[in-house]
Swiss-Prot record:
Superkingdom of the organism of origin: Bacteria
Organism field: Pectobacterium carotovorum subsp. carotovorum (strain PC1)
Lyase among keywords: yes
Gene (name only): mtnB
TM region positions: none
Protein name as catalogued: Methylthioribulose-1-phosphate dehydratase
Gene3D superfamilies given in the database record: Class II aldolase/adducin N-terminal domain (3.40.225.10)
Length: 205
């Protein structure tokens, strides 16, 4: 896929995310890998539902350097960390949905475990509802390098798959392509909504 095709796919994903209401008030950030050295990421403070091609900035994956001198998303370091750690990741989507934000606070443990849902099969490699899918949860931190270090420490002993939550903040998810990242995002959002509803109903029982 050419750079223009990748950007077109990411723009479409951003507009779809905006329509879903998963990135209100200019929140969130999205990126796509161009090659081993560079990615494109959303500029800071842009509404995701109305992004244009010029709202994406070229970033050097190894250093987070932005040749244009413009300001990328504050969380650029988490995107580039994922690209450095896993060469198969081709796109990263970070959203601020209500379900992901609330569930990340309701769950007090270090992981959100999803089990028994048919839609787990929307995640690459998952073939049955009987498996347990663990989504790590990291405490929020305005110090992005410190947060990235905690993600790195986790990934040193447990593979990062599909995505992770930042408590009270939102979801990071990814895929080999923008298309796969979109599917993972939609699948996880459905699963989060189911899990949140299940917990609410059980609490009332």
């Amino acid at each position: 896929m050419t750079e223009n095709q990748q950007l077109t796919a990411l723009l479409a994903a951003c507009h779809w995310i905006g329509e879903k209401g998963w990135c209100p008030a200019t929140g969130g950030n999205m990126s796509v890998r161009l090659d081993d050295a560079q990615c494109l990421i959303t500029e800071s403070g842009k509404d995701k539902g109305s992004l244009q091609a010029e709202d994406f900035l070229l970033v050097e994956i190894a250093t987070n350097h932005v040749p244009s001198g413009r300001t990328p998303s504050a969380e650029t370091g988490l995107h580039t960390l994922l690209y450095r750690r896993e060469p198969t990741i081709g796109a990263v989507l970070h959203t601020h949905s209500v379900n992901a934000t609330v569930l990340s606070r309701v769950e007090k443990g270090a992981e959100l475990v999803l089990h028994g849902y048919e839609m787990q099969k929307s995640l690459a490699g998952q073939t049955t509802h009987l498996d347990r899918v663990a989504i790590p949860i990291f405490d929020n931190d305005q110090d992005i390098p410190a947060l990235a270090q905690r993600v790195t420490e986790y990934a040193s002993h447990t593979p990062l798959r599909y995505g992770f939550l930042v408590r009270g903040h939102g979801l990071y998810c990814w895929g080999a392509t923008v298309k796969e990242a979109r599917r993972h995002l939609e699948g996880l959002e459905f699963l989060f909504q189911c899990e949140l509803q299940r917990r609410l109903l059980e609490a009332k029982a």
